């Protein structure tokens, strides 16, 4: 028979006693008040001498996220409308507007729009056609 040297500092909670259960739940210590404190100095993402973000400090995390750089200039500017409310035809129309402005094409065609692409209004058809002919 083994002996256990564990001696709890507090009386264990009887899980069958409802009043003890609620007392244990109500005595949980609260989180620190700094969670919603936004008065701390914001993290400057351009200053490399800035101290690193403490990932355990919620206010520093949110400051780093809120100070994140905008999208790069070449990125397609899809409106802020959520994807759930935007139909696929609306999304494709906005996508092609960005390409015609000379923005980079994401994913399968990372390049500028060419005159050959203007002849193929279907998504990336020009690029796919050219890539198939290269294999011949």
UniProtKB/Swiss-Prot annotation:
GO terms for biological process: symbiont-mediated suppression of host cytoplasmic pattern recognition receptor signaling pathway via inhibition of TBK1 activity; symbiont-mediated suppression of host NF-kappaB cascade; symbiont-mediated suppression of host toll-like receptor signaling pathway. The keyword Transferase does not apply. Residues 66-86 are annotated as: Disordered. Pfam families: UK (PF02512). Keywords: Host-virus interaction, Inhibition of host innate immune response by virus, Inhibition of host NF-kappa-B by virus, Inhibition of host TBK1 by virus, Inhibition of host TLR pathway by virus, Viral immunoevasion. Belongs to the asfivirus DP96R family. Inhibits cGAS-STING-mediated type I IFN expression and NF-kB activation by inhibiting TBK1 and IKBKB/IKKB. Inhibits host TBK1 phosphorylation. This is TBK1 inhibitor DP96R. It comes from African swine fever virus (isolate Pig/Kenya/KEN-50/1950). The lineage of its organism: Viruses, Varidnaviria, Bamfordvirae, Nucleocytoviricota, Pokkesviricetes.
């Amino acid at each position: 028979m083994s002996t256990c040297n564990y001696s709890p500092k507090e009386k264990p909670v009887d899980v069958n006693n409802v009043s003890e259960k609620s007392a244990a739940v109500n005595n949980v210590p609260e989180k620190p008040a700094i969670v919603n404190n936004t008065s701390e100095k914001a993290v400057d993402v351009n200053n490399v001498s800035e101290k690193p973000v403490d990932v355990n400090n919620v206010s520093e995390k949110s400051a780093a996220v809120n100070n994140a750089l905008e999208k790069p200039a070449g990125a397609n500017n899809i409106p802020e409308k959520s994807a759930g409310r935007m139909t696929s035809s609306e999304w494709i129309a906005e996508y092609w507007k960005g390409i015609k402005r000379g923005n980079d094409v994401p994913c399968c065609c990372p390049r500028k729009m060419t005159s050959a692409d203007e002849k193929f209004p279907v998504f990336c058809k020009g690029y796919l056609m050219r890539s198939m002919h290269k294999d011949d």
